[in-house]
From Swiss-Prot:
It is found in: Golgi apparatus. This is ADP-ribosylation factor D. It comes from the Eukaryota. Its main location: Golgi. Belongs to the small GTPase superfamily. Arf family. Pfam families: Arf. The gene is arrD. The keyword Protein transport applies. CDD domains: Arf_Arl. It comes from Dictyostelium discoideum. Residues 188-216 are annotated as: Disordered. GO terms for biological process: intracellular protein transport; vesicle-mediated transport. GO terms for molecular function: GTP binding; GTPase activity.
Length: 216
């Protein structure tokens, strides 16, 4: 006989992997972050030509991270990966002011994609240990983040080589995923309960009303 959990949200933590897309321009540090999370060490990388995919566990969630190549000629191939995406990690080189407009343009395109509608957005501002990186307020303005109204977003500064900021950003994203799943689970249970009550009400026979005469 199986064991039944009394926690109504226990299904949230089942083993089914949650798909996250890790996107951004080439050289922004996506692959370095991926393998820092996967191996807890910094590995030498070259620009990704297609994609890397790894699954990690964080806050009881199985997260499958898809690190897609960021070269301009390859970005047009991102779209087939959008299906069933739960959240987006957009990686920006905070030391590269020459390409920040290009990064902002790519992010704006992503925000218009129907398949990514509602996906929480985590921005990793990498290379904060470089000389004169963009601070978070400047980066927020440059990326036009205040114009994003249809989803939750968060900017996390990182120093990947030291592992600073990566897990904090993933904490935020995991918390939002859990909150979303709890909300969907509650709405589903509430809808089912109301439907059951309605069906029960409809199945009851109509009882004829008795005429009651008032005594005067």
């Amino acid at each position: 006989m199986g064991i039944s959990s009394s926690n109504p949200f226990s299904s949230i933590f089942k083993s089914k992997a949650i798909k996250l897309l890790m996107l951004g321009l080439d050289g922004s540090g996506k692959t370095t972050i991926l393998y820092k999370l996967m191996l807890n060490e910094v590995v030498s990388t070259i620009s990704t030509l297609g994609y890397n995919v790894e699954t990690i566990q964080h806050k009881h969630l199985n997260l499958t991270l898809w690190d897609l190549a960021g070269e301009e000629r390859i970005r047009t191939l991102w779209k087939p990966f959008y299906n069933k995406c739960t959240a987006i990690i957009f990686v920006v080189d905070s030391s590269d002011r020459l390409r920040i407009d290009e990064a902002a343009s790519e992010l704006a395109k992503l925000m218009k994609e129907e398949e990514l509608k509602g996906c929480s957005l985590l921005i990793f501002a990498t290379k904060q240990d470089c000389i004169s990186p963009m601070e978070i307020p400047e980066l927020t303005d440059q990326l036009g983040l205040h114009d994003i109204k249809d989803r939750r977003w968060y900017v996390q500064p990182t120093r990947t080589l030291e592992g600073i900021g990566i897990y904090e950003g993933l904490d935020w994203l995991s918390t939002k995923i859990i909150e979303d799943r709890k909300s969907k689970s509650f709405k589903s249970k509430f809808s089912f309960s109301n439907k059951s009550k309605q069906q029960k009400s409809n199945s009851q026979p109509n009882t004829p009303r008795k005429n009651i005469q008032m005594m005067t």
